[in-house]
């Protein structure tokens, strides 16, 4: 039996059911997710390789909560408009999403409340989706576990009313029964991505990673598979890049919005206050490779400012970014990336 056949048998439906026994018992979603197919790939006409927007406002940290939320929402809506060079904010969002879409907003909440996507950032994304005609009931804020979402300050909503918010572990079947391959990565995908979502919005945080160098858009997608810990050797290269070649990601990921309101240049992926700073910005793109390249450059510059060694000298250069570019997933050369600052 070859390796691929072995793993397919190993991760059969029976194995998956036995591998996640507690998840079924701790089920919090009182219904099964409906299967939705991607109706159209017309949005790919807007897919702008090598184009990145940085929306930044240094006044963000000093604003009161209501004004801060309003300003962050403006940055998101205007940032997507500038990214797509659209004639208006509604036109920009309508070019990416339609009322028939079921949208998963994949967060990165491993580091807890201090260094996870801010609720006001997610609120701004939801506002954009509403402009595109997406119903609240068709929007799902999502992470690996309910615990991570709660720890980051989000409220779980498993009802059929309003914007949903829950982890893969809240489902009776959190991961597919069938093993999928993407290069050397063999994993079962979250059913939220494989079954429910027709569109994916990737919301990482601007921070470093002790093994991969940085954990940004592409690394955040380790949270959509059941066995990410298997793929951390060699600075997670080529695994991070290869995972993004899978159709579930390649065909559904429509927007990357990296939360850099608070960023971290050392000690990640967990929160380390001494290495965090107010970048006060958002990185917005459709090109995950370009977004990661820009994010890594920001982190390297901050490290230099603080007299920290370059990531390469610490043995954790984010090699996966160049690998992803080599796979045709996007642009990693900084001098070729069209960077728009607003």
Regions found by a protein language model. Name each.
Residues 1-342:
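N-terminal and secondary-structure boundary signal
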């Amino acid at each position: 039996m070859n390796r691929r056949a072995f793993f397919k048998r190993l991760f059969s439906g029976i194995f998956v059911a036995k591998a996640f026994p507690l998840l079924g018992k701790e089920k919090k979603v009182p219904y099964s997710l409906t299967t939705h197919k991607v109706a159209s790939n017309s949005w790919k006409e807007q897919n702008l390789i090598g184009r990145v927007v940085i929306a930044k406002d240094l006044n963000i940290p000093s604003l009161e909560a209501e004004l801060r939320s309003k300003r962050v929402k403006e940055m998101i809506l205007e940032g997507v408009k500038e990214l797509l060079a659209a004639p208006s904010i509604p036109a920009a969002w309508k070019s990416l999403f339609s009322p028939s879409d079921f949208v998963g907003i994949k967060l990165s909440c491993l580091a807890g409340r201090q260094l996870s996507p801010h609720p006001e950032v997610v609120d701004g994304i939801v506002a954009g989706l509403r402009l595109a005609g997406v119903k609240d009931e068709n929007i799902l804020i999502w992470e690996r576990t309910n615990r991570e979402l709660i720890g980051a300050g989000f409220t779980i909503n498993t009802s059929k009313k309003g914007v949903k918010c829950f982890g893969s572990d809240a489902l009776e079947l959190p991961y597919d029964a069938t093993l999928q391959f993407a290069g050397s990565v063999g994993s079962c995908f979250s059913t939220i991505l494989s079954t429910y979502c027709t569109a994916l919005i990737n919301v990482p945080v601007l921070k470093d990673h002790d093994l991969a160098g940085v954990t940004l858009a592409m690394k955040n997608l380790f949270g959509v598979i059941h066995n990410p810990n298997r793929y951390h050797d060699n600075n997670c290269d080529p695994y991070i890049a290869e995972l993004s070649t899978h159709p579930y990601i390649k065909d559904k990921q429509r927007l990357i919005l990296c939360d850099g309101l608070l960023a971290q240049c050392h000690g990640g992926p967990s929160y380390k206050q001494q290495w965090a700073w107010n970048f006060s910005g958002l990185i917005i793109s459709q090109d995950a490779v370009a977004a990661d390249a820009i994010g890594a450059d920001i982190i390297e510059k901050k490290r230099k400012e603080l007299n920290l060694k370059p990531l390469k000298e610490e043995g954790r250069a984010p090699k996966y970014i160049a690998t992803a570019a080599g796979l045709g997933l996007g642009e990693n050369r900084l001098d070729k990336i069209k960077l728009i600052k607003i």
